[in-house]
């Protein structure tokens, strides 16, 4: 072997040696007999270096995986001998190989087994077992090989081809017939021999039993001698977790429901008499987590058996199975309520399934009601935070608790389905008791009682949040709890989790305040003072900003008396935070968006006259405009790029805030009706100069463009005078992304104002198109994926724009561009339909072509256009689908073909027999037979276009064969 290349296998070797090792590896893989050197090295133990041994196994693995079929019988025999010789040397080694080498060897053994067991090496296991006996090094390789075989043949998480699946089924059938009893016997001997002396091997063997039990005869394992051995392992500290996992796999095996019930019951009996059900006496939480998983598996298996049996006529067996399920409930409850959340989480699924069983019963007996109540109390208790939860810096443990809480919420929702009255009553009881003495309780007690009230909102659903109408028992209880919540003073509790839960609950049940509006002032104060928007925690302030906006939106009709008071109290939260003051603002700019929207909602929905609304809106937006002007003056003079970015961000925020206030307007309350047009027009005039700012163009243009989108909706025609100048600036020195984002603005204007904007569109059409052509023609580096994607998106936007123009009543805009320009645009559409393998763009292009044929393809159409139809559009309808990139198995491409068919249909509608005549001359040039040509022409004359669509699909499928 190339010794110098082998030096490069060491992870600490120089890069040049590593490169050489890699090249050598590729060389040996490619060589027909290079692997034999590696086989010899392994068989004779030539190398002591671990990395070289691993390398040799990798080369061997490649041969078996990819070349096995082409090896001669002698070469295949050499592989078998190599593996067995290597295994023999392991038996004599004082120190076993490193685990990574043993794992790789096991993979190679498993691959050889998979390739040869059915044909060349049916005695694989007998040979291996005869060689290794009970030698610990040999047993280790044997067990690792079995796990590697499980991964290759059984593991359901690995995707196999149909051929591999067939092969794997044959292997399992062969093993069941020939060697499984011998393997099971070997496992028993290994477990018995090493249980006291070699815990690692014993655990490995238990893992093998667990892996294989799913597809072998269960009687080989579920018998007295094997189960007693497993149960004895449950009492050994180093083996008990692995034994638990093994029993879990046995219980999980698919089988007849009656047999499954018997198996689980006998197992439970033995576990119970061995004292395992005395959970409170067990201190090892890792074992208990495994035991909880086992009990969960047993419980779910029994529920599944009951579900199957309850559908049969045998009520006696079904009732027995239900009793078996119920007898596990006390143990389930002990595990569910355990202080360790992992132990509790592992039993949740059985608990959930048990509640599902109760939900299906016609009525609950006293014991079942008692069980429901016990589960309810357990869930309520386990929902509590513990002392260690870090609210300021949530890490992995906190994330796990949040997930666990979600599981408990599922249980609570299921409890509500089983017994809504019981849940409501229990929550009411806990809630009232807590609220009466919240001042003296720990935060987790207070938080969970409010949380339970919050969770009722989903557990007892009401359409559109109408929790306070309908069923009087429910509404009066909820109403009473809400009344207590907002009047008992708990919003003053000094813990962020309680504060947040208070506001979340107030907003979830915001419709309560429509029924009892007298509580609104108290809750408003909580939102506005140190409990809410002025809270010491940024996390609380941020969430409250969002919740406050939701609260105001729902209750805006009840806010009239408080509007100006609220606006004055939040005034400092509506200030644009200047980038240079260095002080952290109370709210982030994202939070401020909600505050501006809230202010807008208050002003717009107030009952004051339009004049007052205008005054308030001006008061809200004028400070933004002033700050904007000042910052915009500073920006071009700022030399430091970081400061430039900060200024541009600040300017963008100002525009975003102004834009967000406009969300308050509606069809009932338009900008005009509220007398606010002038204020927003002033904003427009203030913001538009940012478009000509020579620095930070991307950010500023994006912000102003978004504002224009909003103003087109809000100000309607009043915005039109500003569009030409704005467009001119946005088309200057632009990048692909600028254009791509600008086009929807023009499309929006076109679609909304139609003929009104025709003169403007005629003026801007070619400059816009030329800008697009120029950006698309810029050279980009071959591997620059971002640039390629941006160009693709721009191309799509361009075609969408042409589609908007063609589809609207502004189609004259194109017709008036002059023959040369029209031709240029038309060629880009043909190119888009045929040359770019982008079905989204192609589909749009065919829609455009179809529309243009409809507009200009008739007798009074555009001069020269019929000629264009025959020279370019009809050929495009055939050339595009014939491209190799046109994939007819792709749904998006099929839609493109559909539009292509509609284009042909439209041409025939407009040109009649002339079109058919052309096809009869054109199609033979594509090697289409006269019969098929005739057939296509007949289909084209059918009135139902579906026939044509289906025909075209078959036509191109045949053409591509």
Curated annotation (Swiss-Prot):
- GO CC terms: cytoplasm; nuclear matrix; nuclear pore
Entry coiled-coil feature ranges: none
Q: Does the keyword Cell membrane apply?
A: no
Q: Which domain of life is it from?
A: Eukaryota
Can the keyword Nucleus be found in this entry's annotation?
yes
Organism of origin is Danio rerio (Zebrafish)
Q: What does this protein do?
A: Mediates the nuclear export of aminoacylated tRNAs.
The GO terms describing molecular function are:
small GTPase binding; tRNA binding
Query: What family does the entry list?
Result: Belongs to the exportin family.
A GO BP annotation: tRNA re-export from nucleus
Protein name, entry field: Exportin-T
Where does this protein chiefly localize? Answer: cytoplasm
Annotated Gene3D superfamilies: Leucine-rich Repeat Variant
């Amino acid at each position: 072997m190339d010794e110098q290349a082998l030096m490069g296998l060491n992870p600490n070797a120089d890069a040049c040696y590593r490169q050489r090792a890699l090249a050598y590896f590729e060389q040996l893989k490619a060589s027909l007999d290079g692997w034999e050197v590696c086989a010899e090295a392994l068989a004779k133990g030539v190398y002591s270096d671990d990395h070289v041994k691993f390398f040799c196994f990798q080369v061997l693995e490649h041969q078996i995986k990819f070349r096995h079929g082409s090896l001669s019988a002698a070469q295949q025999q050499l592989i078998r001998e190599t593996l067995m010789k290597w295994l023999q040397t392991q038996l004599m080694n004082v120190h076993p190989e490193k685990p990574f080498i043993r794992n790789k060897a096991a993979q190679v053994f498993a691959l050889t087994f998979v390739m040869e067991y059915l044909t060349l090496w049916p005695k694989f296991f007998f040979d291996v077992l005869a060689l290794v006996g009970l030698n610990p090094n040999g047993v280790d390789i044997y067990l690792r090989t079995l796990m590697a075989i499980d991964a290759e043949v059984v593991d359901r998480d690995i995707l196999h081809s149909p051929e591999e699946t067939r092969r794997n089924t044959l292997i399992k059938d062969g093993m069941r017939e020939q060697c499984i009893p011998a393997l099971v016997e070997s496992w028993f001997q290994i477990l018995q021999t090493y249980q006291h002396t070699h815990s690692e091997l014993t655990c490995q063997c238990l893992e093998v039993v667990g892996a294989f039990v799913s597809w072998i005869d269960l009687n080989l394992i579920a018998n007295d001698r094997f189960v007693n051995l497993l149960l004895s392992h449950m009492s050994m500290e180093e083996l008990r977790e692995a034994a638990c996992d093994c029993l879990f796999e046995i219980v999980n095996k698919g089988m007849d429901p009656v047999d499954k019930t018997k198996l689980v019951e006998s197992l439970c009996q033995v576990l119970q008499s061995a004292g395992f059900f005395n959970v409170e006496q067990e201190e090892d939480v890792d074992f208990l987590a495994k035991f909880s998983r086992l009990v969960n598996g047993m419980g779910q298996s029994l529920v599944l058996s009951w579900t199957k049996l309850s559908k049969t006529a045998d009520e006696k067996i079904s009732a027995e199975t239900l009793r078996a399920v119920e007898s596990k409930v006390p143990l389930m409850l002990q595990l569910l309520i355990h202080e360790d959340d992992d132990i509790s989480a592992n039993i949740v699924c059985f608990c959930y399934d048990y509640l599902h069983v109760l939900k299906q019963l016609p009525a609950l007996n006293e014991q079942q009601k008692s069980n429901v109540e016990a589960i309810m109390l357990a869930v309520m208790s386990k929902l509590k935070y513990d002392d260690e939860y870090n609210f300021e810096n949530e890490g992995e443990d906190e994330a796990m608790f949040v997930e666990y809480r979600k599981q408990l919420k599922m249980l609570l929702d299921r409890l509500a389905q089983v017994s809504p009255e019981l849940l409501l009553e229990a929550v009411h009881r806990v809630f009232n008791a807590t609220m009466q003495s919240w001042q003296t309780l720990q935060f987790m007690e207070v938080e969970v009682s409010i949380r339970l009230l919050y969770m009722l909102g989903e557990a007892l659903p009401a359409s559109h949040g109408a929790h306070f109408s309908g069923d009087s028992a429910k509404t009066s209880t909820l109403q009473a709890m809400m009344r207590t919540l907002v009047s008992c003073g708990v919003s003053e509790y000094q813990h962020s989790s309680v504060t947040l839960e208070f506001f979340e609950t107030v907003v979830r049940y915001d419709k309560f305040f429509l029924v009892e509006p007298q509580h609104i002032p108290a809750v408003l104060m909580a939102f506005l003072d140190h409990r809410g928007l002025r809270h010491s925690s940024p996390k609380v302030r941020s969430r409250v900003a969002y919740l406050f906006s939701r609260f105001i939106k729902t209750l805006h009709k009840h806010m009239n008396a408080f509007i100006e008071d609220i606006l004055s109290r939040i005034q400092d939260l509506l200030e644009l935070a200047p980038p240079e003051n260095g002080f952290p603002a109370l709210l982030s700019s994202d939070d401020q968006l909600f505050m501006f929207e809230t202010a807008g909602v208050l002003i717009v929905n107030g009952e004051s006259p339009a004049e007052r609304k205008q005054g308030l809106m001006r008061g809200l937006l004028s400070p933004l405009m002033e700050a904007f002007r000042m910052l915009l003056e500073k920006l071009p003079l700022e030399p430091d790029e970081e400061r430039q970015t900060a200024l541009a961000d600040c300017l963008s925020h100002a525009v975003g805030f102004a834009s967000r206030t406009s969300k308050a307007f509606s069809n009932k309350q338009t900008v005009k009706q509220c007398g606010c047009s002038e204020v927003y027009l002033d904003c427009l005039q203030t913001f538009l100069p940012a478009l000509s700012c020579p620095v930070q163009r991307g950010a500023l243009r994006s912000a102003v463009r978004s504002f224009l989108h909003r103003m087109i909706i809000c100000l309607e025609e009043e915005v039109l005078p500003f569009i030409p100048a704005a467009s001119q600036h946005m088309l200057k020195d632009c990048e692909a992304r600028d254009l791509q984002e600008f086009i929807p603005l023009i499309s929006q204007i076109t679609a909304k104002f139609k003929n009104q904007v025709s003169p403007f569109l005629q003026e801007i059409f070619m400059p816009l198109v030329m800008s697009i052509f120029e950006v698309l023609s810029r050279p980009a580096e071959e591997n620059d994926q971002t640039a390629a994607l941006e160009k693709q998106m721009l191309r799509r936007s361009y075609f969408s724009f042409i589609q908007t123009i063609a589809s609207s009543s502004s189609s004259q805009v194109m017709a008036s561009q002059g023959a040369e320009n029209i031709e240029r645009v038309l060629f880009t559409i043909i190119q888009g339909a045929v040359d770019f393998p982008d079905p989204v763009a192609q589909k749009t292009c065919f829609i455009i072509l179809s529309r243009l044929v409809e507009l200009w393809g008739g007798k009074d159409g555009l001069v020269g256009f019929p000629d264009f139809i025959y020279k370019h559009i009809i050929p495009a309808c055939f050339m595009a689908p014939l491209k190799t990139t046109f994939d007819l198995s792709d749904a998006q491409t099929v839609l493109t073909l559909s539009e292509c068919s509609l284009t042909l249909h439209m041409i025939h509608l407009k040109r009649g027999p002339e079109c058919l005549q052309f096809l009869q001359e054109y199609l033979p040039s594509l090697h289409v037979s006269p019969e098929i040509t005739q057939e296509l022409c007949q289909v084209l004359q059918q009135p139902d276009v579906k026939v044509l669509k289906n025909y075209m699909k078959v036509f191109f499928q045949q053409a591509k064969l």
